[in-house]
Regions:
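SIR2/sirtuin-family catalytic core signature
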Residues: 1-36, 81, 130-135, 145-154, ...
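Active-site glycine-rich loop that binds ribose-phosphate moieties when present
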Residues: 140-146, 173-197
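Generic hydrophobic, helix-prone segments enriched in Leu/Val/Ile
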Residues: 54-55, 63, 68-71, 86-90, ...
């Protein structure tokens, strides 16, 4: 069976240049964060919604003063334009960050497929440095857009499932984006329409290794797929593939997350933190590499 490596922003913790979600929000908002909010998307909304005074999309006069209409409302371009400005700023920040060396190790795995929630194209660039042919199978939706990597008869695919920095408008961020996107994911699951052309098919029908991906409660698109898969296994009595989640043990919700994932028919491998993410990810790499031999 083919193998998929699914990774998130956790691998960018290796090295000095990685940017956390919190730091990214601080960079684009210039506003103090409300750290007690557990949800990533709610933290985003709590900062972005009050940004009318600093968003470039707000219309101003030549003195920098906000323009007000006859009813006292701030004049601005469309909400879509404001959102694009924010996404463009995110893309610019991520584009300036030097990639973690761990992308070299991911490329060394030679997996059939790579799926990432990250916006940057670091893995694509890594394959390009190896003189491999890279073709973009373009689509308006991150559900179907992907890159095909080929060399010497070997082929892999890379999917940035939450959009990418080359097309900032494709970036999935905030509640509206996640809700709309998850609705489309669920439609694919229920109707099977274009299933085989989307990354969703890889989670259901290839062996999947998940690393560097916190699977926060608000990652509702991925949870929807995992719940759907677990229900299908229960109803049919058949399991098409194996999903392995590598959980780094820092003592926070390890037991509860492990139990939940195992109930959803996901195998969990607990990795000791060992004082650094680097040591933990070295162990994960060896585990995946050994499994794929």
């Amino acid at each position: 069976m083919e193998t998929t490596v699914l990774f998130g922003n956790g691998i960018n913790r290796i090295g000095n240049n990685g940017v956390s979600w919190d730091k990214l929000l601080e960079s684009i908002s210039q506003r103090k964060q409300l750290h007690y909010i557990p949800s990533n998307t709610l933290r985003y909304e709590s900062i972005i919604i009050p940004m009318d005074e600093i968003t470039p999309a707000v219309l101003r006069d030549k003195y920098g003063r906000r323009l007000i209409d006859s009813e006292g409302q701030v004049l601005c371009t469309s909400e879509n334009t404001e959102t694009f400005v924010i996404k463009q700023k995110i893309a610019n920040i991520l584009d300036e960050i030097e990639p973690s060396y761990y992308y070299q190790k991911l490329a060394d795995l030679n997996a059939n497929h790579y799926v990432t929630t990250n916006y940057e194209l670091s893995l694509v660039q890594e394959f390009k440095t190896r003189k491999m042919n890279v073709d973009c199978i373009d689509d308006k939706s991150p559900l179907f857009k992907h890159f095909i990597i080929q060399k010497d008869g070997k082929k892999s695919s890379i999917w940035n499932i939450h959009g990418d920095i080359i097309h900032p408008q494709s970036i999935i961020i905030g509640y509206a984006d996640y809700s709309n996107y998850t609705t489309k994911v669920h439609h694919i699951l229920e109707t099977k329409r274009r299933l085989k052309k989307s990354w969703v098919n890889l989670i259901l029908n290839t062996n999947v290794h998940i690393l560097g991906y916190g699977l926060a409660d608000d990652e509702i698109d991925m949870w929807d797929i995992l719940v759907y898969r677990a229900r299908m296994i229960r109803h049919t009595g058949k399991q098409n593939n194996e999903i392995i989640y590598y959980l780094i043990d820092k003592g926070i919700r390890v037991r509860s997350k492990r139990m939940l994932l195992e109930r959803l028919k996901v195998s969990v491998v607990v990795i000791p933190y060992g004082g650094s993410y680097e040591s933990a990810y070295q162990i994960i790499y060896k585990r995946i590499s050994d499994t794929m031999k």
